[in-house]
Amino acid sequence: MSGHSKWATTKHKKAAIDAKRGKLFAKLIKNIEVAARTGGGDPEGNPTLYDAIQKAKKSSVPNDNIERARKRGAGEEAGGADWQTIMYEGYGPNGVAVLIECLTDNRNRAAGEVRVAMTRNGGNMADPGSVAYLFHRKGIVTLEKNGLSEDDVLMAVLDAGAEEVNDLGESFEIISEPGDLVAVRSALQSAGIDYESAESGFQPSVSVAVDAEGARKVFKLIDALEDSDDVQNVYTNVDVSDEVLAQLDTD
């Protein structure tokens, strides 16, 4: 069932992202800069940087912006910020667990913006560890179907360490351990299968089902959080059924 929630969230996000292209570009650029600083500026020797660059390219970030971010992170060019990754935890409407990943150069500003977004949209902050245990870090590769079946994808990635392939309606999501992410992505490339993104993320171990009204409230909270420049990713354990999804589509 988690596939449905992911699909609903992704579909909802895409609509919001179209109106926030500048914010999206800034977040993708930040990912590149941090990846280059952490693992070096050569994408061939730094899989995280490679994947960050590929994701930016898929989202039509100009090559010049990508290259400048890579250079800033690698120290080849001045101007890089001191980015810190901070995780915040909380609960949204209907008791939905929320994990908020920030990448910021100002911890106080990030904390304030997250707190305001949560409290204004039916959420509340939680103590560290009280929500995180409901999620596990996984390698997540997404790809458009393009006529492929679930078996086609499974055959390509099974030996590379893929744990499951989820049908998200218009796309597939491949789940693996984070350490197998590069192998899974490489297996797709070897099979000639194009993919949308490959990155580490958090998958919920337990999900919370919501009705249409609950889903709207959760999506509103996600939107408010993602509107902050400091928020890089928002993970929830909301479960949206096909029936509820159909109701949302008529909104």
Curated annotation (Swiss-Prot):
Top-level lineage group: Bacteria
Primary localization class, coarse: cytoplasm
GO MF term (any one): DNA binding
GO terms under cellular component: cytosol
GO biological process: regulation of DNA-templated transcription
InterPro entries: Integrase-like_N, TACO1_YebC-like_2nd/3rd_dom, TACO1_YebC_N, Transcrip_reg_TACO1-like, Transcrip_reg_TACO1-like_dom3, YebC-like
Name of the protein in question: Probable transcriptional regulatory protein NFA_37020
Organism: Nocardia farcinica (strain IFM 10152)
